[in-house]
């Protein structure tokens, strides 16, 4: 089961809703997954389709227990590669359809026809509970979240730009930074930051999934920090080794051309210890000198040795 399916299954467990929350949630699900149908003799129907059985049960329960609307459930195979079941909740009784549309305000019913309402009704979404219920429904109907082991990405899909912007505004009223882009004929409201995805999971009540995401985030951050430390240490080690090789080459050149005895005593002592201990750090080299010298003093002497070698190299065209 995908992480996205786990989140939806968890959210659907919160099914003891007050009517105001249930209508906000149902309205958002219908907006993403619903279809208004017109039959013969101007009869109307409504369908809600989903591949998630938990969402089907939740919608069925709301329609039956809160709205007292009779429904039928059809099951068919998806046309997708995975061939999952598609659950279709069908409402054919015209009075039930009109009651549903009136309660959820997805479609305006007027004498001259039906008009889709692309706003998020303030009659439905007006306090913290109904706002969270609406966002929860929008996720159940048209949302998905990627496996956080791979990437951080959560999105809602809709076919209307005005509605996409309204939903993004609602989400962002909780301090998030969702954005809207167009993908072919759809509009995508998306969040890509791990921390903000955690915040949204908290808003919709997916607390177990939130903990799982946070554990993954912690492990990924730890791995990234370890990699940065290792890379930094590797770079420093490589730099140290290259410097030591360069110093030893300079000392050998001086010894060959003029002999180390020609060097001042402080540089000669430094050169002899470096030859004897090619692998030790500057700090350790300084501690071996008599009297001991600090790291900066060792570095200064080795630079002077390299400078002498460079001048000898120029003179001899080595």
Swiss-Prot record:
One function term, GO molecular function aspect: endonuclease activity
Top-level taxonomic group: Bacteria
PROSITE patterns the UniProt entry points to: INTEIN_ENDONUCLEASE (PS50819)
DNA-binding region: 281-314
GO biological process: cell division; regulation of sporulation
Function recorded in the entry: Involved in cell division and chromosome segregation.
Name of the protein in question: Probable cell division protein WhiA
Native source species: Clostridium tetani (strain Massachusetts / E88)
Lineage: Bacteria, Bacillati, Bacillota, Clostridia, Eubacteriales
């Amino acid at each position: 089961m995908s992480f996205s399916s786990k989140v939806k299954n968890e959210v659907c467990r919160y099914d003891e809703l007050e009517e105001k929350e249930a209508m906000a949630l149902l309205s958002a699900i219908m907006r993403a997954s619903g279809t208004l149908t017109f039959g013969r003799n101007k009869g109307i129907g409504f369908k809600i389709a989903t591949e998630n059985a938990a969402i089907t049960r939740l919608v069925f329960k709301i329609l039956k227990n809160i709205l007292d609307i009779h429904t039928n459930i059809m099951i068919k195979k998806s046309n997708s590669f995975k061939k999952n079941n598609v659950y279709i909740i069908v409402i054919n009784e015209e009075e039930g359809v009109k009651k549903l549309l009136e309660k959820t305000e997805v479609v305006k019913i007027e004498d001259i026809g039906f008009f889709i309402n692309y706003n998020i009704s303030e009659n439905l979404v007006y306090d913290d509970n109904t706002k969270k219920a609406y966002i929860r429904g929008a996720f159940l109907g048209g949302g998905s979240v990627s496996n956080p082991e791979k990437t951080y990405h959560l999105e809602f899909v809709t076919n209307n730009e005005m509605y996409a912007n309204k939903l993004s505004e609602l989400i962002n009223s909780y301090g998030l930074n969702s954005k809207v882009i167009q993908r072919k004929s759809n509009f995508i409201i998306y969040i890509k930051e791990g921390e903000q995805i955690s915040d949204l999971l908290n808003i919709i009540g997916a607390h177990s999934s939130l903990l799982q995401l946070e554990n993954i985030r912690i492990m990924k951050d730890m791995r990234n920090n370890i990699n940065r430390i290792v890379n930094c240490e590797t770079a420093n080690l490589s730099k140290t080794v290259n410097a030591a090789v360069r110093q030893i080459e300079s000392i050998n050149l001086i010894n060959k051309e003029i002999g180390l005895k020609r060097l001042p005593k402080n540089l000669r002592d430094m050169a002899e210890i470096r030859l004897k201990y090619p692998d030790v750090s500057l700090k350790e080299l300084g501690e071996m000198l008599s009297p001991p010298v600090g790291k900066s003093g060792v570095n200064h002497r080795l630079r002077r040795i390299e400078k002498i070698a460079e001048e000898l190299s120029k003179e001899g065209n080595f």
